[in-house]
């Protein structure tokens, strides 16, 4: 259908990111690390070792750069399709067309952008300087932007511990709800493996007349538990 044509650029980018990107291994103190979207986003970018952060960032960036023309072409196709749809539906601009789907007017959108650029930007700059100070960095580079303010806030967590945390989080919703949620561990509804070609983030698949499946790439951090919940 026509929708598949208009949304194909996003599909191309998603498949390219999940299946085609190859990032070079990197070495720190004699140890070789494999890099991927999942491991970089979930682990290396906030690693406590500055050399791991820096080398993984270079590996990550070089991997992206190899596909920059394809990504740019897909993005241009997306922009053109949105422009065409906006014109066909009689909107004044692509902004108005996209915001209408979320029932947000242009004035509110512009206000948010202004707040981010004028009011939030100075706060973000002070925060990053504080992160650098807390972590003993003389200079903060782009590779350090995702560094945790306190590594204790994102500790290592086992899958069994994650299940326990999930069950505790749903206890206030009642016994019946908890029993239903418990099925996802007993019946193995979650695909944890961070396999090559698997997209980053967390997703739910809802096959017809079958319980949902959760797809995620587990890296053993507390942030993964939030995704699971």
Regions found by a protein language model. Give the residues of each.
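His/Asp/Glu-rich acidic catalytic environments and adjacent acidic regulatory segments
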Residues: 1-107, 111, 115, 164-187, ...
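Polar low-complexity intrinsically disordered regions enriched in Ser/Thr and small residues
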Residues: 22, 33, 139, 200, ...
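Short acidic (Asp/Glu) and glycine-rich catalytic loops that position anionic groups and cofactors
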Residues: 36-37, 142-147, 208-212
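Hydrophobic alpha-helical segments with strong N-terminal bias
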Residues: 74, 203-204, 214-218
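A metal-dependent hydrolase signature that marks the N-terminal structural subdomain at the beginning
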Residues: 95, 101-104, 108-177
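Intrinsic disorder/low-complexity segments enriched in polar/charged and small flexible residues
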Residues: 147, 186-187, 191, 205, ...
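Short pre-active-site segment immediately N-terminal to the catalytic Zn-binding motif
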Residues: 152-165, 172, 185, 209-229
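Catalytic zinc-binding patch centered on the HExxH motif and its immediate surroundings
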Residues: 155, 190-211
């Amino acid at each position: 259908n026509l929708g598949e044509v208009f949304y194909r650029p996003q599909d191309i980018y998603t498949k390219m990111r999940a299946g085609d990107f190859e990032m070079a291994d990197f070495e720190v103190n004699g140890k070789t690390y494999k890099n991927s979207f999942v491991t970089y986003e979930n682990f290396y970018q906030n690693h406590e070792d500055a050399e791991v952060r820096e080398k993984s960032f270079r590996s990550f960036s070089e991997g992206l750069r190899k596909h920059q023309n394809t990504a740019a072409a897909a993005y241009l196709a997306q922009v053109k399709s949105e422009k065409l749809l906006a014109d066909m539906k009689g909107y004044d601009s692509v902004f108005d067309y996209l915001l209408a789907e979320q029932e947000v007017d242009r004035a509110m959108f512009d206000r948010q952008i202004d707040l981010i650029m004028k009011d939030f930007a100075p706060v973000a700059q002070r925060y990053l300087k504080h992160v650098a100070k807390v972590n003993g960095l003389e200079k903060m580079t782009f590779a350090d932007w995702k560094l945790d303010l306190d590594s204790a806030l994102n500790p290592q967590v086992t899958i069994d511990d994650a299940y326990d945390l999930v069950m505790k989080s749903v206890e206030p919703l009642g016994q019946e709800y908890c029993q239903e949620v418990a099925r996802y561990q007993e019946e193995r509804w979650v695909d944890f493996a961070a396999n090559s070609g698997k997209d980053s983030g967390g997703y739910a698949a809802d096959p017809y007349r079958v319980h949902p499946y959760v797809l995620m790439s587990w890296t053993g951090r507390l942030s993964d538990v939030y995704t699971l919940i």
